[in-house]
Amino acid sequence: MALDIFDKNDFKEKVTKKSFRKEDIFKDGYFTITDIKQAVKNPNRANIFVNGKYRFSLDIFQLTQLNVKIGAKFSEDEIFNLEQQSEFGKLYALGLNYCLIRPHSEKEVRDYLWKKTLNRKLRNKKTGEFYEKKGVSIVSAEQALQRLIEKGYVDDFKFTKFWVENRNQRKGSSIKKLKSELFSKGVSSEIIEQILSESSRNDGEEIQKIIAKKAKKYTDEKKLVAYLARQGFSYDEIKRAILKEEF
């Protein structure tokens, strides 16, 4: 899900050229921003050229915050920091899009961003040769996660409430299974218990939903009992539900 944040006129205003001489590009050991071009594949970002060559990309908010303009000069350490900001910006955008698909737990988002830190073996479409793409820094991944938490896009309370309210709502799901799923996603037992205590879902109603869906498939009572047990329902709950169906 792309976020269309660029306005062409605004972009031009942010990167308005300043007059500078070519001989000043390397003056005093500083690096000069020689050009800024709106990215083609991702128009929400701008490609930054340093000393005549592409170096990194930033989003429009970063251009303003970091005061990156054509003709601006930066030290080697400052350029390195800008590259780290570039990496952070890309990761934050990826994490944000991931969170907007559906709510995710903190562990899910951390695992998603962690994968970006791993080196990947890719294939060049033109030459067919394989090459290794270096992963992003762990620091940038953690910074992106913390920003998502600060902005409220990652919240285990909200995620757990979403999961309990929507997970197999029509098909039915045992409370035990819901707990197991949430625990596997890194949600603490305290949060799970609190949200479930506030929920109207209960095993009595959930098992009836499942029986209504599966009764035709499992005509043999023993097989139905075994299936319900695998779904996390207790033996007593299963027997009560089946007796209720019989009457």
Role assignments for model-derived ranges:
Residues 1-247:
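An alpha-helical, amphipathic repeat domain used for nucleic-acid recognition
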